[in-house]
């Protein structure tokens, strides 16, 4: 028995069950991924014990020479990975990364232009229930009702009318390529700054499979998990002229001591992302997403914008008897994890929704490829054709578990 199993069997049991879920269920939540053993080893290290307020070479605590090495490695690797002037690897999350940028260049009441949450944006891009919507005057933009892609005519019209100080680009449920050059051109017409939140597509950007926002934006924020396949955390890239202000708005502005064990895990993940194999992995994520999207559409599912260019897709259930909530629950019983999601021009509550979101990063980390995506589409269709049929859903779960058993990832942790 492990030390944890001996001392706290309740926690140990929960961890084991979650390991089994990640090993044998099909994880299709677009914002989730599975890290490498090296990343987990770094995150579970003694660095969790060390306080290190400040920045490398300028700490408020002694004994930081080793963690300085780790943070500098993370910074330099991040800059190399994305071609950035400056990187701050201390944000605990993507939300805090966004907050730090806002506080660096905005005052309460300033106007920002951000993507409507129900059209695919993110809470921190100006949702009224989030700090971003409470502190700032938010003008939301969205997608065209015809194409379900970003309506740049609307973005330009709103920018000219409201003269935002900052235009926020990025999304949590947008399956198409983001045109950073178009946003930059609009921002320049009104003298606005640009912040790109590339949390969902950072891995694709690092691999050159999605245009980089770095040349077009004063600030680029991201999480370090999702497609980047690192630990749960955040990061900010910016132009050198904003580096000092940005750093001070992370610490002491909105955070105290950085999480050095997480920064170590970020450093390891960035090294992985700099390796040639990472591009092949990202290419497979996109191939899997496109195959799955095509197969779902063949089976009669409607996808927002008619497909995907990246790692995710949004299934629109409008006009069917299903809701996103019902679909999520049925698929969960079939061993397939997705999340209910609002769709553009949503008519239902965000607790119910008319759609669900699917992503391929975690399944790709397991080793699934195009052939398996054909099977996955069949599993999804079978489960959603049998909502309420517990026996049939259990049968589908058996097929899912058998499929995932062919692609072990953390099996050694279950011995």
Swiss-Prot record:
Molecular functions (GO terms): glycine hydroxymethyltransferase activity; pyridoxal phosphate binding
Catalysed transformations (reactions): (6R)-5,10-methylene-5,6,7,8-tetrahydrofolate + glycine + H2O = (6S)-5,6,7,8-tetrahydrofolate + L-serine
Subcellular location(s) per record: Cytoplasm
UniProt site (Plays an important role in substrate specificity): 225
Cellular component terms per the entry's GO annotation: cytosol
Pfam families: SHMT
Cofactor field: pyridoxal 5'-phosphate
One biological process term in Gene Ontology: glycine biosynthetic process from serine
N6-(pyridoxal phosphate)lysine modified-residue sites: 226
Pathway the protein contributes to: One-carbon metabolism; tetrahydrofolate interconversion; Amino-acid biosynthesis; glycine biosynthesis; glycine from L-serine: step 1/1
Main localization of the protein described in the UniProt heading: cytoplasm
Keywords: Amino-acid biosynthesis, Cytoplasm, One-carbon metabolism, Pyridoxal phosphate, Transferase
Subunit and partners: Homodimer.
Function per UniProt: Catalyzes the reversible interconversion of serine and glycine with tetrahydrofolate (THF) serving as the one-carbon carrier. This reaction serves as the major source of one-carbon groups required for the biosynthesis of purines, thymidylate, methionine, and other important biomolecules. Also exhibits THF-independent aldolase activity toward beta-hydroxyamino acids, producing glycine and aldehydes, via a retro-aldol mechanism.
Family: Belongs to the SHMT family.
UniProt name for this protein: Serine hydroxymethyltransferase
Organism lineage: Bacteria, Pseudomonadati, Thermodesulfobacteriota, Desulfuromonadia, Geobacterales
Gene: glyA
